[in-house]
Design a protein with these regions (language model features):
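Conserved SAM-binding loop of SAM-dependent methyltransferases across substrates and taxa
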Residues: 118-128
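A short acidic, Gly/Pro-enriched loop at the edge of an enzyme's catalytic core
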Residues: 189-201
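N-terminal auxiliary segments of SAM/dcSAM-dependent transferases
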Residues: 1-71
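Conserved class I S-adenosyl-L-methionine
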Residues: 108-117, 133
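A short, conserved alpha-helix within the catalytic core of class I
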Residues: 210-213
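Conserved alpha-helix/loop element of class I SAM-dependent methyltransferases that forms part
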Residues: 87-109
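Conserved SAM/SAH-binding beta-strand->alpha-helix loop
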Residues: 138
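S-adenosyl-L-methionine
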Residues: 150-186
Length: 213
């Protein structure tokens, strides 16, 4: 996780109180936090940063949960195709994320992408804003988005028929500013950010995923 985001983070378990988290950093590389523990001085909740990925869901979300389909490779590959299929030259791919991003204001300030999934909207917005933070409660989605952010490419297996699939390599567009992007595992209903941290907000495909939108 990018180190400068630490000053924006608060404890989601203490909401609506905005309690700053204290960071115990074990490993950092340049301006990235690789391994750390974030502690709340008010309620003693602990939030880990592991291999660069920050886990900032409420403590109840960090307990062992029933396996979700959104953590499986077939669903992950399906989402990667739906977000980036046009970059693979697929004639059936959608340009929706590019069009949605074109409707957002540009300029200075940060944008929060709630329910970012595997990150296409955030990458599109990196051309227009100083900072884009994507959150999702799927660990697999966030790790895939961060892999694309860090490496600029990722392999995926696209199902053809039955159990048959073909491997493709997804490569990001050069114009996307990956130094302006971060992805965090978090809950849309318990956002771990200080008030007024963002001047723009997107919540695509989220309304049907929360109990009380």
């Amino acid at each position: 996780m990018k180190k400068f985001l630490l000053e924006m983070l608060i404890c989601p378990a203490c909401l609506p109180e905005e309690t700053e988290l204290r960071a115990d950093i074990m490993i950092e590389q340049a301006e990235d936090v690789v391994e750390a523990t974030l502690r709340c001085p008010r309620c003693a909740s602990i939030y880990p940063i592991q291999d660069g990925t920050a886990f900032l869901g409420p403590p109840s979300d960090q307990r062992e949960r029933t396996p979700s389909k959104y953590e499986t490779e077939p669903v992950l590959s399906s989402y990667l195709w739906s977000h980036y299929g046009d970059l693979l030259g697929d004639e059936q791919a959608s340009s929706a994320y590019r069009q949605w991003a074109s409707l957002m204001d540009g300029g200075s300030g940060a944008v929060l992408d709630v329910g970012s999934a595997v990150g296409r909207f955030a990458f599109e917005m990196s051309r227009k804003r100083d900072l884009v933070v994507g959150i999702d409660n799927s660990v697999a989605f966030i790790k895939a988005a961060r892999e694309l952010m860090a490496n600029g490419r990722r392999k995926l297996a696209l199902r053809q028929e039955g159990h048959l699939s073909r491997e493709e390599t997804l490569t990001l567009l050069e114009g996307w500013q990956t130094d302006r992007i971060e992805f965090i595992v978090a809950d849309a209903l318990a956002l771990p950010f200080r008030s007024h941290s963002f001047s723009g907000l997107a919540s695509l495909n989220i309304i049907d995923k929360v109990p009380l939108p």
